[in-house]
Amino acid sequence: MNVWAERMEVCVVHPGWEPIYGREAVLESWRRILKAPESPEIRGQSPQVLVNDPVGTVVCFEEIKGNFLIATNLFVKQSGRWRMFHHHAAPTDARPSEGSAPPASIN
């Protein structure tokens, strides 16, 4: 999970959860989600990228079992690479535009 920032505070807000603060707690929350037997496939769609160096923002849809979330991901440049320091996802009735695909790489 090298996407997470190492030299600053991080936070994640999973849908329906309390905010989780601190790198180790955030990483553990993702491990629990992704390693659970019922772990769903998460498909990112329609990413919109805003760069205000040294901070980058990606707003996208996340599709899980035909349902959609809207997610905001905040990144900071560390050692020349973009590292996430905040992720927030929540249910939405909106839908991504047709034909959108996730980016191949952020770095």
What are these regions (language model features)?
Residues 2-5, 10-107:
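A beta-strand edge to alpha-helix "cap/lid" segment located at domain peripheries
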